Amino acid sequence: MVLTFLRALLRLAFRTRLTGDLASLNKRRVLITPNHMSFLDGILLAVFLPVKPVFAVYSSISSQWYMRALRSLIDFVPLDPTKPMSVKHLVKLIGQGRPVVIFPEGRITVTGSLMKIYDGAGFVAAKSQATVVPLRIEGAEYTPFGRLGGVVKRRLFPRITLTVLPATTIPMPQAPRARDRRRLAGEHLHHIMMEARMAVRPRETLYQAFLAARTRYGLFKPCIEDVNFKPDSYSGLLKKSLGVGRILERYSQPGEYVGLLLPNATVTAAAILGASMRGRVPAMLNYTAGVKGLTSALTAGEIKTVFTSRQFLDKGKLWHLPQGITQVKWIYLEDLKDTLTTQDKLWILGHLLLPRRAMVAQQPEDAAMVLFTSGSEGHPKGVVHSHKSLLANVEQIRTVADFTPCDRFMSALPLFHAFGLTVGLFTPLMTGARVFLYPSPLHYRIVPELVYDRNCTVLFGTSTFLGNYARFANPYDFARLRYVVAGAEKLQDHTRELWMEKYGIRILEGYGVTECAPVVAINVPMAAKSHTVGRILPGMDSRLVSVPGIEQGGRLQLRGPNIMKGYLRVEHPGRLEAPQADNGEGQMEPGWYDTGDIVSFDEGGFCQIQGRVKRFAKIAGEMVSLEIVEQIARNASDDKQHAATIKPDGNRGEALVLFTTDAQLTREQLMHSARELGSPELAVPRDIRLLSQLPLLGSGKPDFVTLREMAEQPEDRRE
């Protein structure tokens, strides 16, 4: 009677809905593992689940007066992690056919993300051979019964959804010690919990996700700022997006790829959202690619119109781009400010009140953005991402990292770079965090000062950029940082050590590719291992395909919700080439993406990048990694820049060429360094060439196309 009344009350107050695979709850041995969002969670499960479960409750809580009062309504057993008999009792209950509920986090979330997963729940599942039924509770965190006060906008009666996910099992891990078996079972359960979160993510477009964040975190919460130092709230950014979107649609057609040549600024974010809401597909153009690279990108995407800014072209000294590229129409945003009519202003005002009506009909699977590869190995390719793939990567990041609305991001990587776009713009916007957009990562003195001045807690960049920030920053500039993430290139040991020694901060290395929106793997405080790029993100499948001549690791192929829709190539303008990959048996499988990277995994699932397939030299029949060559050079001269490439060799097939900024570096030093590292003599180049500065791409990576061309030109050798 009491439970019936509570069910009616909770359904009325919170529009509570139970959905999903309810049949799995009726199996004989069932362990239900919900996430923990509020003090309501236990009551919600007790009154809405179609079975009567036994709740495992920590003994410190079960002894409280309110739990004793609920004893007649709810079955629960005290759980003491320090006493093995508690676990044995739960295993026995499951064996008797009683459904058991354990909250694996052990506490209510204070971040909105998953908290630490205790190993005990996973070990109970493995020991009892139970059917594990993941269950997601969504919405309860916004009630006054949650613990996110000051983090999210509280609501008295939010909608609460209980989703039962497909059942799975946790086999008993094979390990010699019970402690290791317990830990591995806990890691397996953690993976199940992360996959459950990914499974219930909403099906939205970018604009819909932005509006949902605006509702969730507050219409007037500051969310974005640039070098004008005028923060915009979600409503302020919405207003600008409506204005820019209204203008952009005059010069383009629905579904058209629209070029954006703009810096890291609030207006760029507004242009992305504005174009997206009106059914246009923003194509982020790399202004460092030069006339040749930009022409290739425009041709591949059949882009007819490019929106840019006179002020940006002036400050960046980029007028050679519109002057050298005449096949497209250039539209300058400054010229359009005064073109808004009274009708346009009324349209903007009306859609500020009813913003959902501003979006033209779209599906999450539709094209949302075009990003271009760096062109480090040839022509830039257009990478078309859907709303679904971009937002899936944002959700994957939020699943493993505990970003909250209290965080402040420093985003200096350009928005035409996938890392800068997803991690530097979409992730903070969808998380309720505040982001500061800065137009250049190369200002090594200014960026640290802004991190200090704006109280930033999250910084990301390439190893090169982070190393230079550390050189010029004051030790107190980074005092508030809690996440420093390196990606886009291998994190150098001296950069890692400098940050730890000078600032006491551990850099978390990650790995990504533009085609995966871009983050594939990342170290996080909950799961980190030096000299790896972390574990593959939840929701993704991975496999290694063997490569002849390479013994350790294999070619990494990926499949998941964050994979691109396809390529746009300059050879076939406008034609979308869907991803597919050779499975190693000569069969092309659609949906898989071949990264071209040689990767290995350790026993804990941590990923180590060995190098790109194209960055291996075949010398006298032996495969030599060019990254090993660069590692040898860095070990011999760690304060200079080095890049290795190849040139044809009539006798041995290919020969190594090392470009360096160290005028004193000799082959004898490289030989000594190779012996220290245990590297083969075959990896020591004979051709060493001095450059005052390595040619770099806009992302900070070496320009290997230019270096390869330089290597094939005859030049005096230094041995």
Swiss-Prot record:
GO BP field: fatty acid metabolic process; phospholipid biosynthetic process
InterPro entries from the UniProt entry: Aas, AMP-bd_C_sf, AMP-binding_CS, AMP-dep_synth/lig_dom, ANL_N_sf, ATP-dep_AMP-bd_enzyme, Plipid/glycerol_acylTrfase
Record Gene3D superfamilies: 3.30.300.30, N-terminal domain of ligase-like
Transmembrane segments: 258-277, 409-433
Membrane in keyword set: yes
Assigned keywords, A-Z: Acyltransferase, ATP-binding, Cell inner membrane, Cell membrane, Ligase, Membrane, Multifunctional enzyme, Nucleotide-binding, Transferase, Transmembrane, Transmembrane helix
AMP-binding: region residues: 233-646
CC per GO annotation: plasma membrane
Disulfide partners: none
Membrane topology reported for the UniProt record: Multi-pass membrane protein
EC number assigned by the record: 2.3.1.40, 6.2.1.20
GO molecular function, one term: acyl-[acyl-carrier-protein]-phospholipid O-acyltransferase activity
Tagged with keyword Cell inner membrane: yes
Reactions the enzyme catalyzes: a 2-acyl-sn-glycero-3-phosphoethanolamine + a fatty acyl-[ACP] = a 1,2-diacyl-sn-glycero-3-phosphoethanolamine + holo-[ACP]; a long-chain fatty acid + holo-[ACP] + ATP = a long-chain fatty acyl-[ACP] + AMP + diphosphate
Region (Acyltransferase): 15-138
Record's function text: Plays a role in lysophospholipid acylation. Transfers fatty acids to the 1-position via an enzyme-bound acyl-ACP intermediate in the presence of ATP and magnesium. Its physiological function is to regenerate phosphatidylethanolamine from 2-acyl-glycero-3-phosphoethanolamine (2-acyl-GPE) formed by transacylation reactions or degradation by phospholipase A1.
Protein family (similarity comment): In the N-terminal section; belongs to the 2-acyl-GPE acetyltransferase family.
Protein known as: Bifunctional protein Aas
